[in-house]
C-alpha cells in the first residue's frame, strides 16, 4: 500500500517532425520509442507524405501520447530510447534497425530538437526531428482499482492489456495508461478499438535504458513491431505483458470499446454541424417564415401596388396582421432586421412602421431618393407625414388630392377613377374568393388591386407578338382583335383626340396648382383639346364593361357612352375653334392659291390620316403636359385664344391660322418674325425625319406633338400679323399631314426615365406598302414645295434664317428648361440629369423671358417642348434610338 501510494501519474507526449537518412532507403522507415521497461511506442509515416522540407528527409508530422504511473525514484535519470526501424513487407521477418539515439527527459519541460541517429557500430546514419514533453500530473489516487474498473468491468481481472495503434490525424495525441506491471491503453484517433486480439511473444530479455546487448534490443523491437503491425492492419491490438509481470495474457473484452471521457481518453472534438442542427432545430422556423408566402401569394401581390416606397399604407398592415396571427409571435421581430429600403418592399407590422418612418426622417438623402423613385414609378406617397420636413416643399404638389384648379381636379379624379376601374375589373368578387381562408376578416372595403404580371400596357409590339407566337398563341389572337377594335374606335372618333400620358400628369400637378382656375369652356378647349380629353376621361364611370382598355392598354374607351362623351368633348372644342376661325377669316386675303394647293396636297394622304394609333396612358399624358409645364401662369388664360386648328382643313376649306387676337393687334409683317418662325419650324422639321426601323408595333401618331407648335405659332400670328403666318402655317399644315401619314411604331418609354423624350420616328407601318410609299413621297414633295413658296414670298428670309437659327435654337432649349424649372415642382429631382454647363444659359434665358414680349414668351414656351426631343434623357432611350428592335 505504501508503494502504491507513492506512485505518481505522468504524461509523455512525442511528436516526430521528420527523419532524414544519409543513405536513401527503399521504404519509409518507422520510429519506435521506449521508456524504461514499458512497451515501445511505434510511429509510422503517413501514407502520402508531404513535400520534403529538406533534401532526403521523410515527413512524419505525427506522434503519440500516453499516461505513465511511476514512482519518482524511477525517473532520476529518465532516458528515452528512439530507434529508426526498417519495416519488412510481411510481418514474419524481423525489422531492420537502421539507427538509434538516447534522449534525456526532463519532467515538466517540453523541448524540440534534432537528434543524431547512429547505427550499431556508432556510425552516423541520419537525423531525427522530435518534440517531446514529460509532464507530472500529480499523485496517483489511492484507489487503483477505480481507474481499472471502467476499462474492464468483467474481463480484466489482474491481467494487463496493451493496445498499440497508429493515429490517423496529424499531431493527434492518444493516451496510453501504463504502470510498472506493464499495463498500457492507447486509443486510435477515429475511436475504433481492438477487434481481433492476438497474443504476442513474451519478452524474455527485457531491454532497459542501460542495455547494450544487440540481440536483446532486436528482440525488443520485434515485439514492438508485432504490436504495431496488428494495430496498423485493422486497428487491432495485441495484448501482452512483459517479463517482470509474469502473468498470463487474457483477451480484452469488446466492452473496452465503450470507453468514455472518464478514462482520460482523448477523443477528437465534436463537429459543430453534427450537434447544432439538433440543438437549434431551424426547420420549424423556416416553415413559419415561408408559410405566409406559400399560403397567401395573392395577399402579398395585393400589397405591392398599395405599398409606397417611403412607407406602407394601412391596408398592407392589416394583411400582414392577419397573416401574422397564424404564425408564432417570434416572427414579429423579423421585419426589424430589415433596412429602410427592404422594409418598404414588403409590408411591416404596425410597431415597425413607426420605427421605419423615424429612420427615414433621419436620412434625408435616402428619403429624397425614395420619393424620387416613387414619382418615377407613378406611386406618389399618400402620407405626407413620412416625408422629411426639409423635403416636404418638394413634394407638396404630389400629395394634394383636390386642388382649386379645374385641371388638377380633373387629373386627380381621373387617377382615382383609374384605380377604381382597376379594382372593379381585376377583383370582381375579392371577398368571396379570399374570405373563406380567414385572411381578410378585418379588411373593410375592397382590397387593393391585384398585380397582373402579363398586363399589356404599350400595345402589341413586334417583340410581344413574336413571344406570344411561341408561348401563348391564343392570347396573340385576343390582342390582335383588341388592336383592330381600338383602331376602328379611333377612326370613328377622329384624329385629334388623345389620352394624356402619366408622367406629365405627375410632373405638372404642382405647376398647375399655381395657375388660376379656369372656366369650363376654357378647360375644354385648352391646347387643342387635351384638357377636354382629361375632362372626358375623368367623367368616365369605372363600371364600363370595356373600361379596362382605358386603364391597361391605353386605347380609347370602348363603350358607346364613352364614345359619345369623347365625341361631344371633341365637337365642343371644334366649335369653339370654328367660331374663332370664322372671326379671323376677314384677315385672310392673301395666299388663296397657296391654301388651295395645300388642300390638294393633303388629299392623297387622307387615307393614312384616318389610321390613328392609340397611345397608352403612360406614354400619352406626357405630350399633353409638357406644353403646360413650359407655359407661364400668365399665359394659361390665353390658351383658348392662341389655340389653332391648323389640321382642320381636311374638308377642303382654307387653312385657318388667325385667332381673335388678330382683330385686336394688327401688327405689320416683319422679316424677323417670319424668319424666327421659319427657323423654329426648321428645328421642328429636324425631329420629323424618319430615324427608326419598323421593328416596333406600338403605332403612335405624330400629330400628338403638334399641339405645342399650334399654340406657339398661333401666338405668333396673333402678335405679328397674318402675312408672316401664311407661309409658316402652310408649312405646318403640310408637315402635319406628312407626319400624320408617316408616323412610326415607337417603343414604350421606360418608367425609369426622369423626363421622357418627345423624339418619335415618322414612318407608319401600314399594311399597304403602296400607301406608305405615296405618303412618304407626298410629305417630301409638300415640304419642298412649302420651302420654295416661302423663299419666293420672302427672298431675304434664307440669310436671316441662317443667321438666327443658332440663337433661336439656343433660346428654345434654354427657355424650356428655365420655364420648366420655374413652374414644375418635379424639376428639382430631374435637375440631376441636366448638363451642368447650362446653368449660365438658363439664367440668361430666365432674364430673356422676363424682359421679352408676350409673343416671344409664347414662342419659347410653345417650341420649348420641341427642343426636348433633341436630348436623350435616359440610357433606355439611347438604347431604343440606336438599337432598333430592342425594347426595354
UniProtKB/Swiss-Prot annotation:
Q: Which InterPro entries match?
A: MAP10, MAP10_C-term
Its chief place of residence is: cytoplasm
One GO CC annotation: mitotic spindle midzone
Localisation: Cytoplasm, Cytoskeleton; Cytoplasm, Cytoskeleton, Spindle pole; Cytoplasm, Cytoskeleton, Microtubule organizing center, Centrosome; Midbody
Per its UniProt entry, which superkingdom is the organism in? Eukaryota
For this entry, list what GO says about its biological process.
cell division; cytoplasmic microtubule organization; mitotic spindle midzone assembly; positive regulation of cytokinesis; regulation of microtubule-based process
- Chain intervals for the UniProt region annotation (Disordered): 398-454, 508-602, 620-642, 654-683, 699-836
GO molecular function terms attached to this record: microtubule binding
Q: Recite the UniProt keywords alphabetically.
A: Cell cycle, Cell division, Cytoplasm, Cytoskeleton
Where does this protein have compositionally biased stretches of type Polar residues? Answer: 524-541, 590-600, 661-683, 699-714, 722-745, 772-786, 825-836
Q: Where is the composition biased (Basic and acidic residues)?
A: 572-589
Q: What does this protein do?
A: Microtubule-associated protein (MAP) that plays a role in the regulation of cell division; promotes microtubule stability and participates in the organization of the spindle midzone and normal progress of cytokinesis.
Q: Which PANTHER family match?
A: MICROTUBULE-ASSOCIATED PROTEIN 10
* Protein name as it appears in the record: Microtubule-associated protein 10
Task: Name the source organism.
Answer: Rattus norvegicus
| Gene name linked to the record | Map10
Amino acid at each position: 500500500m505504501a508503494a502504491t501510494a507513492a506512485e505518481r501519474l505522468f504524461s509523455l507526449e512525442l511528436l516526430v517532425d521528420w527523419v532524414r537518412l544519409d543513405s536513401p532507403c527503399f521504404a519509409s522507415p518507422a520510429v519506435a520509442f521506449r521508456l524504461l521497461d514499458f512497451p515501445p511506442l511505434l510511429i509510422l509515416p503517413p501514407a502520402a507524405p508531404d513535400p520534403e522540407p529538406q533534401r532526403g528527409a521523410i515527413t512524419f508530422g505525427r506522434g503519440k501520447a500516453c499516461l505513465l504511473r511511476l514512482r519518482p525514484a524511477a525517473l532520476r535519470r529518465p532516458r528515452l530510447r528512439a530507434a529508426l526501424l526498417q519495416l519488412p513487407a510481411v510481418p514474419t521477418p524481423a525489422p531492420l534497425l537502421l539507427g538509434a539515439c538516447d534522449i534525456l527527459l526532463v519532467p515538466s519541460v517540453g523541448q524540440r530538437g534534432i537528434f543524431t541517429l547512429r547505427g550499431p557500430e556508432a556510425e552516423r546514419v541520419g537525423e531525427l526531428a522530435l518534440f517531446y514533453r514529460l509532464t507530472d500530473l500529480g499523485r496517483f489516487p489511492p484507489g487503483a482499482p477505480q481507474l481499472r474498473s471502467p476499462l474492464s468491468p468483467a474481463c480484466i481481472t489482474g491481467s494487463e492489456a496493451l493496445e498499440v495503434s497508429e493515429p490517423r490525424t496529424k499531431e493527434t495525441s492518444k493516451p496510453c495508461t501504463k504502470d510498472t506491471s506493464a499495463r498500457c491503453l492507447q486509443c486510435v484517433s477515429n475511436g475504433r478499438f481492438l477487434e481481433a486480439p492476438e497474443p504476442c511473444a513474451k519478452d524474455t530479455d527485457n531491454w532497459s535504458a542501460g542495455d547494450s546487448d544487440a540481440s536483446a534490443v532486436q528482440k525488443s523491437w520485434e515485439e514492438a513491431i508485432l504490436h504495431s503491425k496488428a494495430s496498423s492492419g485493422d486497428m487491432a491490438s495485441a495484448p501482452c505483458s512483459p517479463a517482470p509481470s509474469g502473468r498470463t495474457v487474457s483477451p480484452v473484452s469488446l466492452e473496452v470499446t465503450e470507453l468514455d471521457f472518464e478514462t482520460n481518453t482523448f477523443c477528437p472534438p465534436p463537429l459543430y454541424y453534427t450537434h447544432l442542427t439538433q440543438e437549434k432545430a431551424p426547420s420549424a422556423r423556416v416553415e413559419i417564415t415561408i408559410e405566409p408566402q406559400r399560403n397567401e401569394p395573392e395577399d402579398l401581390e395585393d400589397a405591392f401596388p398599395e405599398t409606397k416606397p417611403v412607407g406602407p399604407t394601412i391596408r398592407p398592415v392589416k394583411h400582414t396582421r392577419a397573416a401574422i396571427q397564424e404564425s408564432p409571435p417570434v416572427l414579429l421581430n423579423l421585419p426589424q432586421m430589415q433596412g429602410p429600403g427592404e422594409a418598404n418592399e414588403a409590408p411591416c407590422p404596425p410597431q415597425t412602421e413607426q420605427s421605419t418612418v423615424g429612420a427615414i426622417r433621419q436620412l434625408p438623402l435616402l428619403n429624397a431618393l425614395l420619393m424620387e423613385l416613387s414619382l418615377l414609378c407613378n406611386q406618389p406617397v399618400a402620407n405626407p407625414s413620412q416625408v422629411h420636413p426639409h423635403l416636404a416643399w418638394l413634394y407638396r404638389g404630389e400629395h394634394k388630392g383636390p386642388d382649386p384648379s379645374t385641371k388638377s381636379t380633373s387629373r386627380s379624379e381621373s387617377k382615382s377613377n383609374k384605380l377604381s376601374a382597376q379594382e372593379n375589373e381585376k377583383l370582381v368578387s375579392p371577398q368571396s374568393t379570399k374570405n373563406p381562408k380567414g385572411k381578410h376578416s378585418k379588411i373593410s372595403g375592397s382590397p387593393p388591386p391585384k398585380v397582373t404580371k402579363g398586363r399589356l400596357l404599350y400595345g402589341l409590339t413586334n417583340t410581344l407578338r413574336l413571344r406570344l407566337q411561341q408561348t401563348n398563341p391564343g392570347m396573340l389572337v385576343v390582342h390582335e382583335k383588341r388592336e383592330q377594335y381600338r383602331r376602328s374606335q379611333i377612326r370613328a372618333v377622329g384624329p385629334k383626340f388623345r389620352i394624356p400620358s402619366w408622367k406629365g400628369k405627375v410632373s405638372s400637378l404642382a405647376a398647375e396648382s399655381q395657375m388660376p382656375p379656369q372656366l369650363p369652356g376654357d378647360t375644354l378647349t385648352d391646347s387643342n383639346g387635351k384638357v377636354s380629353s382629361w375632362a372626358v376621361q375623368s367623367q368616365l364611370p369605372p363600371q364600363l364593361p370595356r373600361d379596362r382598355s382605358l386603364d391597361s392598354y391605353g386605347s380609347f374607351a370602348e363603350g358607346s357612352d364613352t364614345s359619345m362623351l369623347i365625341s361631344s368633348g371633341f365637337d365642343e372644342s371644334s366649335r369653339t375653334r370654328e367660331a374663332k376661325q370664322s372671326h379671323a377669316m376677314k384677315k385672310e386675303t392673301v395666299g388663296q392659291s397657296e391654301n388651295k394647293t395645300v388642300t390638294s396636297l393633303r388629299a392623297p394622304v387622307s387615307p393614312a390620316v384616318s389610321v390613328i394609333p392609340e397611345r397608352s396612358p403612360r406614354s400619352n399624358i406626357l405630350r399633353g403636359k409638357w406644353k403646360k409645364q413650359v407655359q407661364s401662369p400668365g399665359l394659361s388664360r390665353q390658351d383658348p385664344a392662341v389655340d389653332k386648328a391648323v389640321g382642320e382643313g381636311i374638308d377642303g376649306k382654307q387653312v385657318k391660322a388667325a385667332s381673335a387676337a388678330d382683330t385686336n393687334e394688327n401688327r405689320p409683317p416683319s422679316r424677323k418674325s417670319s424668319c424666327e418662325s421659319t427657323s423654329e419650324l426648321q428645328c421642328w422639321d429636324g425631329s420629323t425625319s424618319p430615324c427608326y426601323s419598323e421593328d416596333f408595333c406600338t403605332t403612335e401618331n405624330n400629330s400628338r406633338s403638334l399641339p405645342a407648335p399650334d399654340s406657339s405659332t398661333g401666338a405668333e400670328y396673333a402678335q405679328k400679323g397674318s402675312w408672316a403666318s401664311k407661309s409658316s402655317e402652310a408649312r405646318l399644315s403640310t408637315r402635319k399631314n406628312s407626319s400624320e401619314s408617316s408616323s412610326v411604331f415607337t417603343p414604350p418609354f421606360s418608367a425609369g426615365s426622369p423626363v421622357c423624350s418627345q423624339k418619335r420616328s415618322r414612318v407608319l407601318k401600314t399594311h399597304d406598302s403602296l400607301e406608305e410609299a405615296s405618303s412618304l413621297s407626298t410629305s417630301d414633295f409638300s415640304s419642298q414645295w412649302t420651302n420654295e413658296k416661302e423663299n419666293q414670298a420672302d427672298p431675304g428670309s434664307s440669310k436671316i434664317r441662317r443667321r438666327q437659327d443658332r440663337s433661336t435654337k439656343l433660346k428654345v432649349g434654354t427657355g424650356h428648361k428655365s420655364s420648366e424649372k420655374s413652374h414644375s415642382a418635379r424639376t428639382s429631382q430631374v435637375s440631376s440629369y441636366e448638363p451642368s454647363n447650362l446653368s449660365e444659359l438658363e439664367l440668361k434665358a430666365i432674364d430673356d423671358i422676363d424682359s421679352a414680349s408676350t409673343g416671344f414668351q409664347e414662342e419659347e414656351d410653345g417650341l420649348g417642348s420641341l427642343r426636348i426631343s433633341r436630348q436623350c434623357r435616359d440610357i433606355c432611350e439611347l438604347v431604343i434610338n440606336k438599337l432598333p428592335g430592342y425594347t426595354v
